[in-house]
Curated annotation (Swiss-Prot):
Residues 250-263 have a biased composition (Acidic residues). It comes from Campylobacter jejuni subsp. doylei (strain ATCC BAA-1458 / RM4099 / 269.97). The lineage of its organism: Bacteria, Pseudomonadati, Campylobacterota, Epsilonproteobacteria, Campylobacterales. It holds the Pfam family Ribosomal_S2. This is Small ribosomal subunit protein uS2. GO terms for molecular function: structural constituent of ribosome.
């Protein structure tokens, strides 16, 4: 579990410039130094350890925790640690409705499965070069946007977010659906939007890595507690039909997009 030394070495205590802050974060601020707010690491440590246990217990109950972080310095670490603990993730961009309109998202994931099946059974080789190219492009796009959640069959039980300001749409959707939000809170964040806040820097690469690493560790610890009672879920994959293949091909040729890009 995280230590005070870990927090200091990773720069978790460095907040934003004093002109860029949310007054609601005042209770988590230790002071100010050279125009930068310094976060109270005693509180960070306390909240971190409490939240670690919450996440561990959720994983022990078999719950799904979705990792969300699309900014450059977060994407790589977020994907790495989500995969290490076997949880879904979004690190490219958040499509509007990923949780509130999950049925439509599942339909898009199905299209990805259809294209992969066409590659597997060789039916894509029967198409023209242009048709095959358009399908390949669509597959790449679907993988970038939805690859991290392709095995998520239902809405998540909890989300872990890096930068709640940037990922405001994801946080809004979670709040609307009453899905608990776990997140580091920098000095420009609104703590009222987060169920389990951890005051800390959400910009520095080492700080982001530490948060992702600890959440993955908590999840793996919870999964280990569950192993003795765990049962494999039945494989309920639906057979892909020729009609589905045709629909995906027609859509690819019309270059139809999906979802709305978060600003």
């Amino acid at each position: 579990m995280v230590s005070m030394r870990d927090l200091l070495e990773c720069g978790v205590h460095f907040g934003h410039q004093t002109r860029r802050w949310n007054p609601k974060m005042k209770k988590f601020i230790f002071g100010e130094r050279k125009g930068i707010y310094v976060i109270d690491l005693q509180k960070t440590l306390r909240y971190f350890r409490y939240t670690y246990n919450i996440v561990r217990d959720a994983a022990a109950e078999g719950k799904t925790i979705l990792f969300v972080g699309t900014k450059k310095q977060a994407g790589g670490a977020l994907k790495e640690y989500a995969e290490k603990c076997g949880m879904p993730y979004v690190n490219h961009r958040w499509l509007g409705g990923m949780m509130t309109n999950f049925g439509t998202i599942r339909q898009s994931i199905r299209k990805l499965e259809v294209i992969e099946k066409m590659e597997e059974d060789g039916s894509i080789k029967l198409l023209t070069k242009k048709e095959a190219l358009m399908l390949t492009r669509k597959k790449e796009k679907l993988l970038a946007y939805l690859g991290g959640i392709r095995y998520m069959k239902t809405q998540p039980d909890m989300i872990f977010v890096i930068d709640t300001v940037k990922e405001k749409i994801a946080v809004q959707e979670a709040n609307r659906l009453r899905i608990p939000v776990v997140a580091p809170l920098d000095t420009n964040c609104d703590p009222d939007l987060v169920t389990y806040p951890i005051p800390g820097n959400d910009d520095a690469i080492r700080s982001v890595q530490l948060f992702c690493q600890e959440m993955a560790e908590a999840i793996n610890e919870g999964k280990a507690l569950r192993e003795q009672d765990g049962e494999a879920l039945p494989n309920e994959e639906k057979e892909i039909t020729d009609e589905e293949k045709k629909e995906v091909l027609d859509e690819s040729m019309s270059e139809e997009d999906f979802g709305e890009e978060q600003e």
